[in-house]
Amino acid sequence: MYYKFSGFTQKLAGAWASDAYSPQGLRPVVSTEAPPIIFATPTKLSSGPTAYDYAGKNTVPELQKFFQKSDGVPIHLKRGLPDQMLYRTTMALTVGGTIYCLIALYMASQPRNK
């Protein structure tokens, strides 16, 4: 005997094998026909600009030459003032955050006076 959960009575009820194996009215789809082809006619490709045309100029070779020059300047400071400001800001925030964490750990380790 096969059982199926009845949504109406909220109990198990006797059912046929096909109902028990396909719950809630879901039936396996048996289709003998293939779905219609969406693009049955050949599509015409556009003769517009290719991906390379609107991607812009390839600047990688110039940047490689610029960053590989041996002029004694570290790689993270090669572009001048903006790189220096970014580096100094990052280092200041890192040192400040480290000091803040150490102070917070020190304060958390001390017992409170009552």
From Swiss-Prot:
Transit peptide: 1-55
Gene Ontology cellular-component terms listed: mitochondrial inner membrane; mitochondrion; respiratory chain complex; respiratory chain complex IV
A GO biological process held by the record: mitochondrial electron transport, cytochrome c to oxygen
Residues annotated with N6-acetyllysine modification: K69
Gene Ontology molecular functions: protein-macromolecule adaptor activity
Cell location: Mitochondrion inner membrane
PANTHER family: CYTOCHROME C OXIDASE POLYPEPTIDE 7A, CYTOCHROME C OXIDASE SUBUNIT 7A-RELATED PROTEIN, MITOCHONDRIAL
Described purpose of this protein according to its UniProt entry: Assembly factor that mediates the formation of some mitochondrial respiratory supercomplexes (respirasomes), thereby promoting oxidative phosphorylation and energy metabolism. Acts as a molecular adapter that associates with both mitochondrial respiratory complexes III (CIII) and IV (CIV), promoting their association. Mediates the formation of various mitochondrial respiratory supercomplexes, such as MCIII(2)IV(2), composed of two CIII and two CIV, and the CS-respirasome (MCI(1)III(2)IV(2)), composed of one CI, two CIII and two CIV.
UniProt-recorded name of the protein: Cytochrome c oxidase subunit 7A2-like, mitochondrial
Organism whose genome encodes this protein: Bos taurus (Bovine)
Organism classification: Eukaryota, Metazoa, Chordata, Craniata, Vertebrata
Gene: COX7A2L
